[in-house]
Amino acid sequence: MPEGPEIRRAADNLEAAIKGKPLTDVWFAFAQLKPYESQLTGQIITRIETRGKALLTHFSNGLTLYSHNQLYGVWRVIDTGEIPQTTRILRVRLQTADKTILLYSASDIEMLTAEQLTTHPFLQRVGPDVLDARLTPEEVKARLLSPRFRNRQFSGLLLDQAFLAGLGNYLRVEILWQVGLTGQHKAKDLNEAQLNALSHALLDIPRLSYTTRGQADENKHHGALFRFKVFHRDGEACERCGGIIEKTTLSSRPFYWCPHCQK
Protein backbone atom coordinates (compact mmCIF):
# COMPACT_ATOMS: atom_id res chain seq x y z
CA MET A 1 0.00 0.00 0.00
CA PRO A 2 1.36 3.47 -0.82
CA GLU A 3 2.45 5.46 2.22
CA GLY A 4 2.02 9.12 3.06
CA PRO A 5 4.77 10.49 0.78
CA GLU A 6 3.42 8.62 -2.26
CA ILE A 7 -0.15 9.74 -1.55
CA ARG A 8 0.96 13.37 -1.19
CA ARG A 9 2.91 13.25 -4.47
CA ALA A 10 -0.17 11.82 -6.18
CA ALA A 11 -2.24 14.69 -4.77
CA ASP A 12 0.34 17.18 -6.04
CA ASN A 13 0.04 15.71 -9.55
CA LEU A 14 -3.75 15.91 -9.45
CA GLU A 15 -3.68 19.50 -8.22
CA ALA A 16 -1.22 20.53 -10.91
CA ALA A 17 -3.56 19.11 -13.56
CA ILE A 18 -6.93 20.58 -12.62
CA LYS A 19 -6.84 22.84 -9.56
CA GLY A 20 -8.66 26.13 -10.19
CA LYS A 21 -10.17 25.05 -13.53
CA PRO A 22 -13.94 24.76 -14.06
CA LEU A 23 -15.14 21.16 -14.19
CA THR A 24 -16.76 20.50 -17.56
CA ASP A 25 -17.95 16.99 -16.73
CA VAL A 26 -18.23 14.88 -13.58
CA TRP A 27 -18.99 11.16 -13.40
CA PHE A 28 -19.28 8.72 -10.49
CA ALA A 29 -19.72 4.96 -10.68
CA PHE A 30 -21.63 4.59 -7.41
CA ALA A 31 -25.36 5.32 -7.36
CA GLN A 32 -25.22 7.29 -4.10
CA LEU A 33 -22.81 9.76 -5.72
CA LYS A 34 -24.76 10.27 -8.96
CA PRO A 35 -26.76 13.27 -7.63
CA TYR A 36 -23.51 15.17 -7.17
CA GLU A 37 -22.54 15.00 -10.85
CA SER A 38 -24.68 17.99 -11.80
CA GLN A 39 -23.89 19.83 -8.56
CA LEU A 40 -20.16 19.72 -9.25
CA THR A 41 -20.20 20.50 -12.98
CA GLY A 42 -19.03 24.09 -13.37
CA GLN A 43 -17.40 24.13 -9.92
CA ILE A 44 -13.63 24.21 -9.41
CA ILE A 45 -11.34 22.13 -7.25
CA THR A 46 -9.85 24.50 -4.69
CA ARG A 47 -7.31 22.09 -3.18
CA ILE A 48 -6.55 18.41 -2.68
CA GLU A 49 -5.60 17.58 0.88
CA THR A 50 -4.08 14.39 2.28
CA ARG A 51 -4.82 12.89 5.68
CA GLY A 52 -2.39 10.03 5.87
CA LYS A 53 -3.48 7.68 3.10
CA ALA A 54 -6.82 9.40 2.41
CA LEU A 55 -7.42 12.14 -0.17
CA LEU A 56 -9.81 15.03 0.36
CA THR A 57 -10.75 16.82 -2.87
CA HIS A 58 -12.31 20.17 -1.95
CA PHE A 59 -14.75 21.88 -4.34
CA SER A 60 -15.73 25.54 -4.57
CA ASN A 61 -19.33 24.83 -3.52
CA GLY A 62 -18.19 23.53 -0.12
CA LEU A 63 -18.42 19.80 -0.84
CA THR A 64 -15.46 17.46 -0.35
CA LEU A 65 -14.81 14.12 -2.05
CA TYR A 66 -13.28 11.65 0.42
CA SER A 67 -11.37 8.74 -1.10
CA HIS A 68 -9.09 6.09 0.34
CA ASN A 69 -7.12 4.03 -2.15
CA GLN A 70 -6.64 1.07 0.20
CA LEU A 71 -4.70 -1.65 -1.63
CA TYR A 72 -5.86 -1.27 -5.21
CA GLY A 73 -7.09 2.27 -5.82
CA VAL A 74 -5.09 4.55 -8.08
CA TRP A 75 -5.53 8.08 -9.45
CA ARG A 76 -4.40 8.96 -12.98
CA VAL A 77 -4.12 12.20 -14.96
CA ILE A 78 -4.90 12.17 -18.69
CA ASP A 79 -5.52 14.69 -21.44
CA THR A 80 -9.24 15.32 -21.81
CA GLY A 81 -10.58 13.12 -24.60
CA GLU A 82 -7.86 10.50 -24.19
CA ILE A 83 -9.07 6.91 -23.72
CA PRO A 84 -6.77 5.10 -21.26
CA GLN A 85 -5.72 1.55 -22.00
CA THR A 86 -6.45 -0.23 -18.73
CA THR A 87 -8.42 -3.13 -17.31
CA ARG A 88 -9.05 -1.28 -14.04
CA ILE A 89 -12.60 -0.34 -13.05
CA LEU A 90 -13.30 3.40 -13.22
CA ARG A 91 -14.89 4.90 -10.12
CA VAL A 92 -14.54 8.69 -10.52
CA ARG A 93 -13.94 11.03 -13.46
CA LEU A 94 -13.39 14.77 -12.91
CA GLN A 95 -12.89 16.57 -16.23
CA THR A 96 -11.76 20.06 -17.22
CA ALA A 97 -11.27 21.53 -20.69
CA ASP A 98 -7.72 20.20 -21.00
CA LYS A 99 -7.08 17.65 -18.24
CA THR A 100 -9.06 14.87 -16.59
CA ILE A 101 -8.34 12.99 -13.38
CA LEU A 102 -9.55 9.42 -12.95
CA LEU A 103 -9.87 7.22 -9.87
CA TYR A 104 -9.74 3.49 -10.53
CA SER A 105 -10.55 0.44 -8.40
CA ALA A 106 -11.10 2.23 -5.06
CA SER A 107 -14.28 1.41 -3.13
CA ASP A 108 -14.03 3.77 -0.14
CA ILE A 109 -15.44 6.96 -1.70
CA GLU A 110 -17.85 9.45 -0.13
CA MET A 111 -19.10 13.00 -0.66
CA LEU A 112 -18.99 15.08 2.51
CA THR A 113 -20.31 18.44 3.61
CA ALA A 114 -18.16 20.71 5.77
CA GLU A 115 -20.04 19.48 8.84
CA GLN A 116 -19.62 15.81 7.90
CA LEU A 117 -15.88 16.35 7.51
CA THR A 118 -15.64 17.08 11.23
CA THR A 119 -17.40 13.84 12.20
CA HIS A 120 -16.16 11.35 9.59
CA PRO A 121 -15.05 8.15 11.41
CA PHE A 122 -11.69 7.74 9.64
CA LEU A 123 -10.82 11.43 9.85
CA GLN A 124 -11.76 11.47 13.54
CA ARG A 125 -9.59 8.42 14.23
CA VAL A 126 -6.49 9.35 12.26
CA GLY A 127 -3.61 11.12 14.00
CA PRO A 128 -1.61 14.16 12.88
CA ASP A 129 -0.13 13.84 9.39
CA VAL A 130 3.66 13.51 9.30
CA LEU A 131 3.75 15.69 6.17
CA ASP A 132 1.88 18.54 7.86
CA ALA A 133 4.56 21.23 8.16
CA ARG A 134 2.88 22.55 11.29
CA LEU A 135 3.60 19.32 13.18
CA THR A 136 6.77 19.63 15.30
CA PRO A 137 9.14 17.07 16.88
CA GLU A 138 8.07 18.38 20.29
CA GLU A 139 4.45 17.52 19.55
CA VAL A 140 5.48 14.07 18.29
CA LYS A 141 7.48 13.50 21.48
CA ALA A 142 4.48 14.45 23.61
CA ARG A 143 2.37 12.04 21.60
CA LEU A 144 4.92 9.24 22.09
CA LEU A 145 4.81 9.78 25.86
CA SER A 146 1.04 10.12 26.12
CA PRO A 147 -0.81 7.45 28.13
CA ARG A 148 -2.41 6.20 24.93
CA PHE A 149 0.85 5.38 23.14
CA ARG A 150 3.75 5.22 25.63
CA ASN A 151 3.33 1.50 26.34
CA ARG A 152 2.98 0.39 22.71
CA GLN A 153 5.78 -1.50 20.93
CA PHE A 154 7.11 0.46 17.96
CA SER A 155 6.56 -2.53 15.65
CA GLY A 156 2.82 -1.92 15.83
CA LEU A 157 2.69 1.73 16.86
CA LEU A 158 4.47 2.97 13.73
CA LEU A 159 1.81 1.28 11.57
CA ASP A 160 -1.10 2.73 13.53
CA GLN A 161 -2.64 5.68 11.68
CA ALA A 162 -4.18 6.85 14.95
CA PHE A 163 -0.67 7.60 16.21
CA LEU A 164 0.70 9.43 13.17
CA ALA A 165 -0.99 9.44 9.78
CA GLY A 166 1.02 8.61 6.69
CA LEU A 167 3.46 6.11 8.17
CA GLY A 168 3.64 2.60 6.74
CA ASN A 169 5.96 -0.36 6.56
CA TYR A 170 8.93 1.05 4.63
CA LEU A 171 8.89 4.19 6.76
CA ARG A 172 8.62 2.09 9.93
CA VAL A 173 11.78 0.11 9.22
CA GLU A 174 13.75 3.08 7.89
CA ILE A 175 12.90 5.26 10.91
CA LEU A 176 13.88 2.56 13.40
CA TRP A 177 17.13 1.90 11.54
CA GLN A 178 17.92 5.61 11.56
CA VAL A 179 17.65 5.79 15.36
CA GLY A 180 19.24 2.38 16.00
CA LEU A 181 16.25 0.80 17.72
CA THR A 182 14.42 -2.50 17.31
CA GLY A 183 10.68 -2.80 16.93
CA GLN A 184 10.19 -4.25 20.41
CA HIS A 185 10.99 -0.98 22.20
CA LYS A 186 8.36 1.25 23.80
CA ALA A 187 8.52 5.01 24.28
CA LYS A 188 8.32 4.70 28.06
CA ASP A 189 11.62 2.80 28.09
CA LEU A 190 13.68 5.27 26.03
CA ASN A 191 16.10 7.83 27.42
CA GLU A 192 15.86 11.51 26.54
CA ALA A 193 18.36 11.33 23.67
CA GLN A 194 16.57 8.36 22.11
CA LEU A 195 13.19 10.06 22.43
CA ASN A 196 14.48 13.21 20.78
CA ALA A 197 16.12 11.27 17.95
CA LEU A 198 12.97 9.25 17.31
CA SER A 199 10.71 12.31 17.44
CA HIS A 200 12.79 14.01 14.75
CA ALA A 201 13.15 10.87 12.58
CA LEU A 202 9.38 10.31 12.59
CA LEU A 203 9.06 13.59 10.69
CA ASP A 204 12.38 13.94 8.88
CA ILE A 205 12.34 10.61 7.03
CA PRO A 206 8.79 10.82 5.63
CA ARG A 207 9.43 14.42 4.58
CA LEU A 208 12.72 13.50 2.91
CA SER A 209 10.98 10.67 1.07
CA TYR A 210 8.23 13.04 -0.08
CA THR A 211 10.54 15.79 -1.31
CA THR A 212 13.39 13.79 -2.83
CA ARG A 213 12.56 10.14 -3.49
CA GLY A 214 13.26 9.38 -7.12
CA GLN A 215 15.33 12.52 -7.61
CA ALA A 216 19.07 12.29 -8.15
CA ASP A 217 22.07 14.37 -7.20
CA GLU A 218 25.05 12.60 -8.71
CA ASN A 219 27.57 15.06 -7.30
CA LYS A 220 26.50 14.76 -3.69
CA HIS A 221 24.81 11.42 -3.21
CA HIS A 222 25.76 9.31 -6.23
CA GLY A 223 22.12 8.40 -6.73
CA ALA A 224 18.73 8.97 -5.19
CA LEU A 225 18.56 11.47 -2.37
CA PHE A 226 16.22 9.14 -0.49
CA ARG A 227 17.49 5.57 -0.46
CA PHE A 228 16.35 2.56 1.50
CA LYS A 229 18.87 1.64 4.18
CA VAL A 230 17.23 -1.65 5.19
CA PHE A 231 13.88 -2.05 3.40
CA HIS A 232 14.08 -4.98 0.93
CA ARG A 233 17.83 -5.23 1.62
CA ASP A 234 17.94 -8.44 3.65
CA GLY A 235 21.21 -10.29 3.15
CA GLU A 236 23.11 -7.10 2.28
CA ALA A 237 25.66 -5.29 4.43
CA CYS A 238 24.43 -2.48 6.66
CA GLU A 239 26.04 0.74 5.45
CA ARG A 240 26.39 2.00 9.01
CA CYS A 241 28.13 -0.93 10.70
CA GLY A 242 28.75 -3.61 8.07
CA GLY A 243 26.46 -6.13 9.75
CA ILE A 244 24.09 -8.22 7.66
CA ILE A 245 20.53 -6.94 7.33
CA GLU A 246 17.90 -9.49 8.31
CA LYS A 247 14.21 -9.94 7.58
CA THR A 248 11.57 -11.13 10.00
CA THR A 249 7.86 -10.49 10.62
CA LEU A 250 6.58 -7.99 13.18
CA SER A 251 2.92 -6.98 13.54
CA SER A 252 2.12 -9.25 10.59
CA ARG A 253 4.31 -7.24 8.21
CA PRO A 254 7.83 -7.87 6.84
CA PHE A 255 10.40 -6.17 9.07
CA TYR A 256 13.96 -5.39 7.97
CA TRP A 257 16.68 -4.53 10.45
CA CYS A 258 20.36 -4.78 11.32
CA PRO A 259 20.79 -6.84 14.51
CA HIS A 260 24.34 -5.54 14.90
CA CYS A 261 23.55 -1.84 15.30
CA GLN A 262 19.83 -1.80 16.16
CA LYS A 263 19.47 -2.62 19.84
Curated annotation (Swiss-Prot):
A zinc finger (FPG-type) spans 229-263. The keyword rRNA-binding does not apply. Keywords: DNA damage, DNA repair, DNA-binding, Glycosidase, Hydrolase, Lyase, Metal-binding, Multifunctional enzyme, Zinc, Zinc-finger. One of its GO terms (molecular function) is class I DNA-(apurinic or apyrimidinic site) endonuclease activity. Its EC number is 3.2.2.-, 4.2.99.18. GO terms for biological process: base-excision repair. Pfam families: Fapy_DNA_glyco, H2TH, zf-FPG_IleRS. It catalyses: 2'-deoxyribonucleotide-(2'-deoxyribose 5'-phosphate)-2'-deoxyribonucleotide-DNA = a 3'-end 2'-deoxyribonucleotide-(2,3-dehydro-2,3-deoxyribose 5'-phosphate)-DNA + a 5'-end 5'-phospho-2'-deoxyribonucleoside-DNA + H(+). Belongs to the FPG family. Involved in base excision repair of DNA damaged by oxidation or by mutagenic agents. Acts as a DNA glycosylase that recognizes and removes damaged bases. Has a preference for oxidized pyrimidines, such as thymine glycol, 5,6-dihydrouracil and 5,6-dihydrothymine. Has AP (apurinic/apyrimidinic) lyase activity and introduces nicks in the DNA strand. Cleaves the DNA backbone by beta-delta elimination to generate a single-strand break at the site of the removed base with both 3'- and 5'-phosphates. This is Endonuclease 8. It comes from Salmonella paratyphi A (strain AKU_12601). The gene is nei.
